[in-house]
Each structure stands twice: as structure tokens, then as C-alpha cells.
Amino acid sequence: MPEKLDIVLWDDPILSKESLPIPPEKFGNGLFDLGRRMLASVGSDGIGLAAPQVGLSMRLFVMAIRDKKDKVTEEIVIANPVATVCSGRAATADEGCLSFRADGRLLYGPVTRYEAVDLLWQDPLTGEERKRHFDGLDAACVQHEIDHLDGIMFFDRRRMKNGWRKKLLKQWEKRR
């Protein structure tokens, strides 16, 4: 199993910056191996992880797609992603983040996401273009990870109405 990477917490400045595109010369075994290490770092309580969450400013994220029994059925390394279509109704569900945890537990809050996403990306080994339709939880994960690449945290997606962000941060401080 590949060596795990340390995951930075929500207040690390790299998480609020837009990530840089991966240039053609970076594609190959090194980029793919980084993706494998990121997948090893996701753990049992996550489904995705973006490069900024491991301290790297590059447009790369990984997903561990799970079945209804929560068993990983596929692992994907995604470089330079572009969501071409976000469709379906917008649904609100509780969402967590591997960079937003306290006492080893993820903190969750409601976030509104589209039900489906068509995604274009480059294969990390070859740089070849790939595309795929994602829906449900996988579509929410794609949107969450692209937000990380754009310097947006999941709590930034919520309106600051009713002190939701403040409440979440207070909860985080308490558990720290």
C-alpha cells in the first residue's frame, strides 16, 4: 500500500487559493503515484481528496467510488478537471471534509449541490482526455473537490445565515 500523506486542516492558507493547472511535462508515473498516495490517505470516512488538502497547489483530485454497502468499487485519479455540465435539481445534504475534523472525527454541515455532473479531465499517466457522467454522491464529491481546487471550502457554499459557519467553527475549536 502506498505511503499516506498528511492532510492539512481547514485554516491552512493553501486551501483558500486557486490551484495551478498541471503542465504536460508533469504527466507520467510520478503524478500517478502521487494520486495513489492521495487515495491511500482518503481512509474509510472519505470518498475524495484534492491536492491542496495535502499541501500541493495543483489541479488534481482523487475519488474512491463506493457501492451501496460502502465498499470501494473504483479508484480514480483526476488531473485538470473541468465540469462541463451540472444538471438535475439542486439538492441539499450534509457534507463533510477531510480537512475539517476534530478529535479524529469529520464535522458535517448542509451544502446544496447539483444532482449530476459531466466531467472532463486528463489521465495522470498519459495526459489523455477522459470524460464521464457522475450522479448522486459521486457528483457531490466531484463538485466538492473542484471547489477545493478553486480555493473554496464546503462551508463557503452555505449562506452565512443563522450563524451556520460560526457555529461550525465554534464546534471545531471545542473539539480541537
Task: Give residue spans per PLM region.
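Positively charged
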Residues: 1-176
